[in-house]
Amino acid sequence: MAHALTAQSHMEVVLSGIYEQFGVTPGINARGNQTLLGGSTPPPEIQDAMDEAMNSGYVVFEELLRKTGDFIAGTLGTEQAFVTSGAAAAISLGTAAALAGNDREKMGLIPDTSSFDRNELVFQKGQDYTYKRCFTLAGAKLVEIGRKDGCTVEEMEAAIGPKTAGIAFYESGAWGDEWVTIEEARALADKHDIRLIVDAAGQIYPLDQFTKTAQIGDVVAFGAKYIGSPHSTGICTGKAEYVESAFLQNFIGYEMAGQEGLARPYGRPYKTDRGEVIGVVAALRRWFSMDHERRLAIEEAKRTAFYRVLNDISGVDVVVPTTPQLGPNTTVFIHFDPAVLGLGGHEVIKRLEEGDPPIWTRTHDDGGSIGIGVQMLSDEQVETVIQRITEIVS
């Protein structure tokens, strides 16, 4: 009887998907590279490279990180780089580098920076965003400057004082003249001999924007999920002195410090595996060699499909942005007029998520519209999303 139950259970496992085996409901990701949905789907060639790495034996991890870091730095035109467990880890480690420099005793104290001469980072108040917390994980204190609608170079310079270790900068690629630009922040950092730490998580396209941003900071963080690497990966790059400090405070530096009898740094939780490391360099090589005009044409065809089918429905207005793509997202916006349809964007989102399979989209324009990131959608999924929206508004 026990054997029969085991066989039956095995058959049920075989007949169901891997997520369903554990009671998890898979759905369609129409948001893009969002952390809440798992971030990315590495292309087959990236998966193959990762599988080969995991099945080809073991390596000395420091050597793996340094040699792959050489490839990353060479590709981006920077002095040094290494793979991290996401962009947030790179931001945190980069901040730790700005705080400790090459002082191994300070590395052993972080995140307790109360005894440090410098433990503050200036940060434009108008750049307030979800991930500014990552700059404080290593013990830095953010000093917010300027206003919600802008900040001048003079205001930033006036905020730089004896406790200032650096400038925390969120690079979205879209800051206007009312803000201190990344170039102006670089000039101030040089003038006052402080560090520029840049969160450039999604600034991976155009390619010249990718390399330019990588080269401007003392430490720059990128999210590797945006180039087709696993969700849990990132890149820390920039000036050798500070990237090396970040490296020594990473998980591998923690292990090395113990072997050398030094104070252990704080970065032990930021671990990567060898498959992830190879996934990043394989994805980076693919990203810099692929035909991006073809990639964008494919994504444009997906956006056009939404416009072609849905824009003729009364009360539905589809907007396909015409500005050149900056960053990872290729989005189409769909507005729903409650006066005509009897429902708005929030209700459409709710019904899409409650369907089978659930479809996850982004709210836009205070809920009156939805945003659909097409870069993670297959052609079949595009048709499914269009069909479901049509059914909801009909």
Outline where the language-model segments fall.
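N-terminal export signals
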Residues: 1-9
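N-terminal glycine-/serine-/threonine-rich phosphate-binding loop
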Residues: 56, 60-65
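Generic N-terminal amphipathic, Lys/Arg-enriched alpha-helix
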Residues: 26-36, 45-55, 328-334
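Glycine-rich phosphate/diphosphate-binding loops and the adjacent beta-loop-alpha structural elements
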Residues: 286-293, 370, 375
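Conserved C-terminal alpha-helix-loop-beta "cap" of PLP-dependent enzymes
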Residues: 18, 309-387, 391
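Conserved PLP-enzyme active-site core in the AAT-like
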Residues: 11-41, 66-84, 88-287, 296, ...
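Non-catalytic C-terminal accessory modules of carbohydrate-active enzymes
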Residues: 299-300
